[in-house]
Structure formats: structure tokens, C-alpha cells
Curated annotation (Swiss-Prot):
This is UPF0145 protein Spro_1658. Belongs to the UPF0145 family. Coiled coil: none annotated. Gene3D superfamilies: Hypothetical protein apc22750. Chain B (3.30.110.70). It comes from the Bacteria. SUPFAM superfamilies: YbjQ-like (SSF117782). It comes from Serratia proteamaculans (strain 568).
Length: 107
């Protein structure tokens, strides 16, 4: 499955638009508590543990997006947008959302 943030895929022709697809993942409050309590993990202004959790959430969201596209018979998703939102009481959770257009492409 081809995944792209661009509206087209170089070298491919979009033959059919199958529909909008999305994927979501939510990081619970514990990651934030661990993040802020574990400031010692920050090296050079970055937290390896926090980045690992964000990467995991992104992978989950992309997997959902790809599964939806396959269900629609698509072999690619174009125009992918990745968003991060804080949700929940006191913005204690982080939601990763990906969306795009499922398409069928050919060379």
C-alpha cells in the first residue's frame, strides 16, 4: 500500500477515488505524568520515552488508516494529514489522528 502526504503519487495514475479514511490513537494520562515526572530522561531538550510513545501512537493510527483503505479496495492513500490534539480533563491525553483519501492507482 502506497501512503503519501501529497495529492498524487509520482509515476502512478489515480484510477478511482474510494473515499476518506482515518485512523486514531490516544495516549493516556500516564504518559504525561511519566513525562513530566521523568524530566531526567530529557537529553538535549528531547524525551526518548515520550517520543517512543508518540511514534507508537502514530503507527497505530496509520495501521487503522491502511486497514480502512484496504476494506474499500484501495491500493494507496493520498493527501494524508497528521494531527495531534490534547483531549480529556485538563488536556491529560494526546490524540493522534491521520486522514487521507483512499484511491486505486496504476502505473
Amino acid at each position: 500500500m502506497q501512503l503519501s502526504t501529497t495529492p498524487t503519487l509520482e509515476g502512478f495514475t489515480i484510477t478511482e477515488y474510494c473515499g476518506v479514511v482515518t485512523g486514531e490513537a490516544i495516549l493516556g494520562a500516564n504518559i504525561f505524568r511519566d513525562f513530566f515526572a521523568g524530566v531526567r530522561d530529557i537529553v538535549g531538550g528531547r524525551s526518548g520515552a515520550y517520543e517512543k510513545e508518540l511514534r507508537k501512537a502514530r503507527l497505530i493510527a496509520f495501521k487503522e488508516l491502511e486497514e480502512q483503505a484496504k476494506e474499500l479496495g484501495a491500493n494507496a492513500v493520498v493527501g494524508i494529514d497528521i494531527d495531534y490534539e490534547t483531549v480529556g480533563k485538563d488536556s491529560s491525553m494526546l490524540m493522534v489522528t491521520v486522514s487521507g483519501t483512499a484511491v486505486k492507482v496504476s502505473r
